């Protein structure tokens, strides 16, 4: 038996509950996510996101004969991959989707394009101006006419390397007529929206009598046309619930199991009608509400509570402030949100190093600009590169040299200073310089790791260092293989972008202590006490990003994801999260 969850978090809690019920050691069932189920049954691997854009750029140039640089292509290349992914996950016919735009009446009015989309398209059309909508329409149609060719070439290019984007991998699995599933039974628990490709997989397993389904919902949003129940109502039509709320069997099983409260399956799905203590609080700023965590935990006597309290962050950027606001009495905390790498000193260090070797180092010279040198040496982690950093600062300030040379900066032939002020621009071409910059950043991180090896640095420092190294090394591999060919400005922008989107996972006992989690981590989990921060419009549900080359009417016609889908999903997350909660703030 394999239990399939929407995410991994629920499996950790289920293990704990099974142990409590049995009171002795038992064999734990196997757990996987639905994404892992697809990946286990495909010979393809999901490619690195940057690798995907690089290969898409090659397909674009081949199919359109527009020799556009990768840095100009990068932004809308990501958008196009998202559209391709959506087409495949919803099992739409790409040929029909891309050909129909030429015929729909929206093209008489291109207002559905956002300003950002227009700017992206304009990069390809140097003679286009905002006043010439007809010209934009003409050029945009020309671009659209190549999208099917790009889609086919891109998928073929990736498949030849044994790679795919996620939607293409999913589609490959469900269209494989020879697919054999490894396990005898798959138990799907707690899903809401199933994309068409996922529904086809579930349907196939059910027809082979290998799948059962457990749905989590409440009667309050199953009647009428409540948006929170939209997908559950649909799922129940195709995939019957093992806990049938209306069956005599479920009530009989509840009695046989000695359920003293008479909690039948019918009762399990009727929780929102019960009384709850709900408090609303307003705060003038995001930071003020984050600091309210301290007050809420203390006033409710929850500091030492284990496992039954959750703080949900609709805006996950509040995590650092929330962590600093926890009362000292709190003994155990489990954090399911990754700590943003951008919030660590390593992000600012990488920024400073890029500036030092860029605007801080005049090309073809042996000197550095004093401003960038001092800013780098004063960074809190500079002492981990060289313990002479403060001595160099004193020397520079006493001499008042605005362009110190390398020999002055590398005091006492110090190894760390020699790495820090290494010349990386004595190369013959752009690719060599980019490799030199990435190797330079990696060597700095290695130096920090070596110098802190014997020191008692905290775990966050160690994890931040490791993640920083991983990000840079990932880019180095793409440049080295020839997949990533960009100018240095674009490379620097990519480095910082990756740091901004990378999180550091926390490790701890998952079912112990106060839970601090994002919205998605609440799926399948129930808590008696919940504090939801940033429960505002624009935060939950989040402002919808509809950046796409496919207009709403076509998306709707071919069953692609629209704003309607996203609103229904957000509504379900909210109502499901609170349905069994007793104290909500």
Q: Where does each model-flagged region fall?
A:
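Nucleic acid-machinery interaction/catalytic patches
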Residues: 1-554
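C-terminal accessory regions
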Residues: 381, 563-585
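Conserved active-site neighborhood of enzyme catalytic/cofactor-binding cores
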Residues: 559
């Amino acid at each position: 038996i394999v239990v399939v969850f929407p995410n991994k978090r629920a499996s950790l809690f289920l293990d704990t509950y099974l142990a409590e019920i049995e009171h002795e050691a038992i064999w734990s069932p196997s757990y996987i996510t639905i994404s892992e189920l697809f990946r286990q049954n495909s010979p393809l691997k999901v490619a690195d996101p940057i690798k995907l854009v690089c290969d898409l750029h090659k397909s674009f140039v081949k199919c359109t004969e527009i020799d556009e640089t990768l840095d100009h292509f990068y932004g809308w290349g990501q958008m196009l991959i998202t559209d391709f992914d959506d087409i495949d996950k919803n099992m739409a016919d790409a040929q029909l989707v891309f050909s129909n735009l030429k015929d729909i009446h929206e093209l008489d009015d291109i207002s559905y394009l956002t300003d950002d989309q227009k700017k992206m398209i304009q990069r390809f059309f140097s003679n286009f101006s905002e006043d010439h909508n007809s010209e934009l329409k003409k050029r945009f149609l020309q671009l659209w006419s190549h999208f099917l060719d790009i889609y086919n070439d891109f998928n073929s290019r990736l498949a030849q390397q044994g790679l795919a984007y996620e939607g293409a991998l999913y589609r490959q699995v469900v269209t494989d007529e020879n697919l054999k599933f490894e396990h005898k039974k798959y138990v799907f628990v707690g899903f809401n929206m199933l994309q068409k490709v996922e529904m086809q997989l579930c349907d196939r397993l059910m027809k082979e009598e290998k799948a059962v389904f457990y749905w989590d919902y409440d009667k309050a949003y199953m009647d009428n046309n409540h948006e929170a129940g939209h997908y559950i109502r649909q799922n129940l039509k195709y995939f019957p619930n093992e806990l049938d709320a209306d069956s005599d069997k479920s009530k009989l099983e509840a009695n046989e199991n000695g359920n003293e409260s008479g909690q039948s399956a019918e009762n399990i799905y009727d929780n929102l009608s019960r009384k709850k203590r709900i408090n609303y609080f307003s705060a003038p700023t995001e930071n003020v509400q984050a600091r309210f965590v301290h007050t809420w935990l203390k006033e409710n006597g929850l500091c030492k509570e284990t496992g039954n309290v959750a703080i949900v962050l609709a805006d996950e950027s509040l995590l650092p402030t929330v962590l600093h606001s926890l009362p000292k009495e709190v003994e155990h905390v489990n954090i399911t949100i990754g700590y943003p790498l951008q919030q660590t000193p390593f992000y600012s260090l990488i920024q400073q190093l890029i500036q030092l070797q860029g605007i801080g180092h005049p090309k073809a010279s042996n000197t550095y600009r004093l401003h960038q040198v001092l800013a780098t040496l004063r960074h809190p982690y500079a002492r981990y590169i060289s313990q002479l950093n403060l001595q160099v600062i004193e020397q520079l300030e006493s001499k008042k040299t605005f362009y110190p040379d390398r020999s002055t900066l590398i005091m006492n032939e110090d190894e760390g200073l020699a790495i820090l002020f290494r010349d990386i621009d004595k190369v013959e071409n752009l690719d060599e310089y980019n490799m030199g910059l990435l190797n330079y950043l990696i060597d700095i991180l290695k130096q920090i790791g070596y110098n802190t090896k014997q020191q008692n640095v905290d775990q966050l420092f160690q994890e931040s260092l490791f993640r920083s190294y991983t990000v840079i090394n990932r880019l180095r591999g793409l440049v080295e293989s020839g997949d990533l060919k960009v100018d240095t400005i674009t490379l620097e922008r990519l480095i910082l972008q990756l740091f901004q989107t990378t999180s550091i996972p926390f490790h701890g006992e998952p079912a112990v202590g106060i839970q601090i989690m994002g919205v998605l981590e609440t799926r399948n989990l129930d808590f008696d006490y919940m504090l939801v921060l940033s429960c505002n419009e624009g935060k939950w549900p989040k402002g919808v990003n509809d950046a796409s080359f496919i207009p709403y009417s076509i998306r709707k016609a071919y069953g692609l994801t629209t704003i309607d889908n996203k609103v229904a999903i957000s509504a379900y997350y909210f109502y499901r999260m609170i349905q069994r909660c007793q104290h909500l703030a």
